[in-house]
Amino acid sequence: MSASGKEKPLKDVPGSYGVPVVGALKDRLDFYWFQGEVEFYKSRMEKNQSTVFRVNFPPGPPGFPEGHGIVLLDQVSYSVLLDNAKVDKRDTLIGSYMPDLAFTGGYRTLPYLDTAEEKHTTYKSLMFEILHESAQRFGPELSSAFDRTAQEWEAKIAKDGSVESLSTAGNMVIQFLYKTITHQDPMATMGDDPHSVYMAWTGVQFAGIAYTNLPHITEELLMHSFQLPFFPIKKKYEQIVEFFRSAGSGLLDLAVTKYGLDREEALHNLVFSFGINTRLGLLKMFPPILFFIARAGAEFQARLKQEIRGRMKKREDAASIQALGDLKLVKATVLEVFRLMPSIFVAFGRARQDLEVESHDARYKIKKGELLGTHQYFVMRDPVVFKDPHSFVPDRFMGSEGAALLPHIVWSNGRETDSPTPTNKQCPGKNQAELIAVQFIAEMFLRYDSWEVTQESSVSATKLDVHLCKLVKRS
């Protein structure tokens, strides 16, 4: 059990940044190459005998700003990052650096704004209105896009024996997301593979923290040492922008007339919010869902199938918000997948003033301006909170005991029991994302009796390598 309040000893934050530049370089090589990010934090947590310690957040010098910071790897210490009064999120989306503004049209976009900035409240209010106005269309558009993707999966498995799920789900996400919010199909203007256009823009923009299939030395020299320039993907970004400029003209009118925003700035904000945050968040949740349900076996799949088909008498029910809300086991399964594999593993902020941060068993003094970060692999597998923290337990969040654990689910940059507002940093689409995940599982079991993934399939904090190899059509 954790000690409480002032009973906890006050300690200096352990750990060291090492020799300038050299220490940062060593940590970066360990993080990306020699250890990998989970072992990187785990080994230092064991060395320091603490879930709170100093570390060089990558990528760091020489090509990126110094990444000196303090990592918070348990449920108690992490909570300070949810306190807007204590932590400033200005320009800390991915740590100590942010990509060149050329990647976002020259504007700081919503995820880089702190809650104390007036535009944060304005832009997030705009996002809420767009999501609210689109709410009834998400279900039907997902059903339509899922049908096309399922047909693609079936054809690919028949031809090649398996199909990779992440990239094939990419166009499904873009189609149903943008048809929902703009009423127009991006494939009509961006071609048959808009996913590749978005991934090029995303990949170059965030190359400093990205993983690829390149040899380690090539990846290190090409991507993690210096920020890549904007010009190689300029035309692809212009494709994305022009789609939103045309298809999203009504959204831009709303931004200008109701919220008093500059039209061009609003354009690039919507491109980023829907093209990075929303698109990637949705995309990254589908492969883990397929993986964990497949690996859970036939008996568990039968339980899900029974719940879904018992409440959904016809295919159209999969798009019904009311029907989806009745799927308690499916919702618990979604939360367990999100616990193990959140779409975003990291979060950062800077201390607004000198403060104390508590862990389960100690208190630590933090100075104003220090960079604080976390990795949710550890936070949502905190053994003090979760029994068998590394195991997939799909009914973990069922019943009264499960409900008591809900505040510890923080995939949305906020607690499951909290709601996003214009004045906090919690994902504005939290509720929609969970509903979409529930619908996706329902769509799968309304079309298939079961499915399997290849033995080589795996999911981790850095890679979603899930290949479907068997789809058993509904009998």
From Swiss-Prot:
GO terms for molecular function: heme binding; hydro-lyase activity; iron ion binding; monooxygenase activity; oxidoreductase activity, acting on paired donors, with incorporation or reduction of molecular oxygen. CDD domains: CYP74. GO terms for biological process: fatty acid biosynthetic process; oxylipin biosynthetic process. The keyword ATP-binding does not apply. Heme binds at C427. Its cofactor is heme. Keywords: Fatty acid biosynthesis, Fatty acid metabolism, Heme, Iron, Lipid biosynthesis, Lipid metabolism, Lyase, Metal-binding, Oxylipin biosynthesis. Its EC number is 4.2.1.183. It is an enzyme of class 4 (lyase). InterPro entries: Cyt_P450 (IPR001128), Cyt_P450_E_grp-IV (IPR002403), Cyt_P450_sf (IPR036396). Pathway: Lipid metabolism; oxylipin biosynthesis. It catalyses: (13S)-hydroperoxy-(9Z,11E)-octadecadienoate = etheroleate + H2O; (13S)-hydroperoxy-(9Z,11E,15Z)-octadecatrienoate = etherolenate + H2O. Gene3D superfamilies: Cytochrome P450. PANTHER family: ALLENE OXIDE SYNTHASE, CHLOROPLASTIC, CYTOCHROME P450 26. Belongs to the cytochrome P450 family. Divinyl ether synthase involved in oxylipin biosynthesis. Catalyzes the conversion of (13S)-hydroperoxy-(9Z,11E)-octadecadienoate (13-HPOD) to etheroleate and (13S)-hydroperoxy-(9Z,11E,15Z)-octadecatrienoate (13-HPOT) to etherolenate. Has no activity with the corresponding 9-hydroperoxides (9-HPOD and 9-HPOT). This is Divinyl ether synthase CYP74M1.
